[in-house]
Structures are given as C-alpha cells and as structure tokens.
Design a protein with these regions (language model features):
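Activation/maturation switch segments at domain boundaries
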Residues: 1, 89-173
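N-terminal leader/targeting and assembly helices and adjacent pre-domain segments
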Residues: 1-96
C-alpha cells in the first residue's frame, strides 16, 4: 500500500507558490517586469524548463542593477586611453551583456528553486494534515561549500519545524 503522497518538480503547489511570490526579491525592476519574470518561472516549473533556458527569456527583460551599472562604468573608464571610442563602446557592450546573462541566470535559479522549495513545503503541510507526516517533522538547511553564498553556508545544518523559518544574519528565511 502506498502512502498517497508525493511531490514532483511540476507540482501545482510549486506553481501556486511561483504565481504568488516569484520575483519579489528582484531589485531594480518595475512591476510589469516582475510579473513577466513571474510568468516565466511558473511556465518553467509547469513545463519542466531548466533555469538556464528560463534565464535566456529573463535576460531579454532585465537590465543591470545599480552595482553592476557602476562596475560597468568604472570598467569603461579604466580602459586604455589609446582605444578608440568605438572600441571602448564595444568592450562595454560585451561586458554589459555578460553581466545581464549572469543576473538573468541568478534570477532564474533563485526564483525557480525558491518556488520549488515553497511547493515542497506546502506538500509537507498537506502530508501533515493527512496524518502522513508527524507534527514534529523538521526541515534542514543543506548547502555545499561551493557555489553557496556566505549567508547560506552559515545556515548549513540548521533545522526548524516544517512551517518554521531559518534564522540568518539578514533575518528569517
């Protein structure tokens, strides 16, 4: 006999989570762009589109954030004075496009993973409500030493109740 419970990456819970929250943490974009990114994330989950492919769609919608814009400006200003204005512009455009690609993949990965995690959490709550998962069940923050930010690495191993929030230096997560 099976428990009658499961989760897959195309879950309705993850899609609902994405519909409600995807894009909320993206800075320096307007509401319309946020809604467009949200739709890409929902479609990505529903259709099983990998974050890298979703990022290709997102990069058409987002620009540089303030720190990236300042870094780009400094880069162009520090280029050799012997370069022609056209060569400087070309180098600047190349770096700008690279920065936007990086930003888009960061957004895609973060928003898809966050939505999938939110969907999993909703599935766990439903499992608890059905008596399939104990009321004392916990979730644990797991990171690898590579690719995770300092905030996430500091949370590694922390466990909280299923509906609880992890405590971080920037507040609850």
């Amino acid at each position: 006999r099976t428990a009658g419970f499961g989760f897959n990456a195309k879950s309705r819970e993850a899609q609902r989570w994405a519909t409600k929250f995807a894009g909320d943490r993206i800075t320096t974009i307007n509401t319309e762009t946020k809604l467009a990114v949200r739709k890409i994330v929902v479609d990505s989950i529903r259709e099983g589109i990998p974050p890298r492919d979703a990022a290709k769609q997102i990069r058409e919608m987002v620009g540089l954030n303030r720190p990236q814009g300042l870094a780009l400006r400094r880069y162009v200003q520090k280029l050799s004075p012997s370069l022609s204005p056209a060569a400087k512009a070309k180098a600047g455009i190349k770096l700008k496009n690279k920065m936007i690609r990086r930003r888009a993949i960061t957004i895609a990965r973060t928003e898809v993973i966050d939505s999938l995690s939110g969907g999993v959490e909703q599935a766990w709550v439903q499992a608890q409500q059905k008596g399939l998962l104990g009321s004392n069940a916990k979730k644990e923050w797991v990171t690898t030493p590579f690719g995770a930010c300092a905030i996430c690495r500091a949370l590694n191993g922390q466990s909280v109740k299923i509906t609880g929030m992890f405590s971080s230096e920037i507040g609850p997560l």
